[in-house]
Amino acid sequence: MSYYAFEGLIPVVHPTAFVHPSAVLIGDVIVGAGVYIGPLASLRGDYGRLIVQAGANIQDGCIMHGYCDTDTIVGENGHIGHGAILHGCLIGRDALVGMNSVIMDGAVIGEESIVAAMSFVKAGFRGEKRQLLMGTPARAVRNVSDDELHWKRLNTKEYQDLVGRCHVSLHETQPLRQMEENRPRLQGTTDVTPKR
């Protein structure tokens, strides 16, 4: 793992969290219990404080940063998709930010809300609970359905379970020269399928 102190502030990572070895955490970063931080994620707490609350996940290639005297927060069970950028914003409890979305300074994503992939949430946006947000700039198009929230929670549980699986079995290795016969397939821990 790449952890860096900055001006005396050292990242804090709960012992039950998993931070991928290629992720980078700098300075004023606080990672809660059961959090998953994916490969190549960058949490750069050299200006504002970055807080990832219990059970949340920050997936591959995500960036978190913020201005001085601000907190950038991912709430409990927050789900941040691959390549998303969070800058000086608040992601509410149980909310999902889709892949490659950008959430700007002072924006608030409400609890149990979903930001569609590739959306741009403008600075200062104030979302409400359980909204589906999409577009550039993002706008609320409707409420999140019970089925969508259930699907989101199943996906988040997969990442929460992945934390333990990574602690047990993830290690650096050399590649095989060819695929072995009867190569097994990995299985998830929930019955989640892609949302269409």
UniProtKB/Swiss-Prot annotation:
Pathway: Amine and polyamine metabolism; carnitine metabolism. Pfam families: Hexapep. Changing residue 90 to V: In strain: O44:K74. Transmembrane segments: none annotated. One of its GO terms (biological process) is carnitine metabolic process. Changing residue 126 to H: In strain: O44:K74. GO terms for molecular function: transferase activity. Residues 187-196 have a biased composition (Polar residues). Overproduction of CaiE stimulates the activity of CaiB and CaiD. PANTHER family: DYNACTIN SUBUNIT P25, GAMMA CARBONIC ANHYDRASE-LIKE 1, MITOCHONDRIAL-RELATED. HAMAP family: CaiE (MF_01525). Belongs to the transferase hexapeptide repeat family. This is Carnitine operon protein CaiE. It comes from Escherichia coli (strain K12).
